């Protein structure tokens, strides 16, 4: 039926199961000085940086694409928990979730996004970086393998720049494959979330 609403097979039970699987599947890889869970009394200004904080990771990738009634982004979830303590900076741009091509992002755009993120980070008490892989071509997508182990779109440089500010940094990544972590010694915590579905 071409007129069927996408996600019409979903139920609250599906979303409950998705949330439980997500909670149990997240992996804590580093947690220096018990930075996590966040002590909300300690941090008045929490900056979230990274495109994956707002990007729908249920879209794209070929056959791994999900058809859901709604997604809850990490940023929406954090705002629900911490309210107006949360600020956001995109930090980088990856383009659309295409199956067989990559959008060309001008260097000036990436430079400006990184600059804006670093400016906001200087005013924050703690930084939550939400990035990693996505469902774009040459990422976690059919019809094209990744070309190297580095995080794309200048993410390693952005994370290194955030860590250089000497503030607590939590790196939260999404993705289904391994990646290089040249900044690991300079961040306080690393959490890997895989792909969590509609209840990210």
Question: What are these language model-derived features?
Answer:
Residues 1-7:
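Conserved, charged catalytic cores of large soluble enzymes
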Residues 8-12, 16-200:
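C-terminal non-catalytic regions of proteins with extracellular/luminal or membrane-system context
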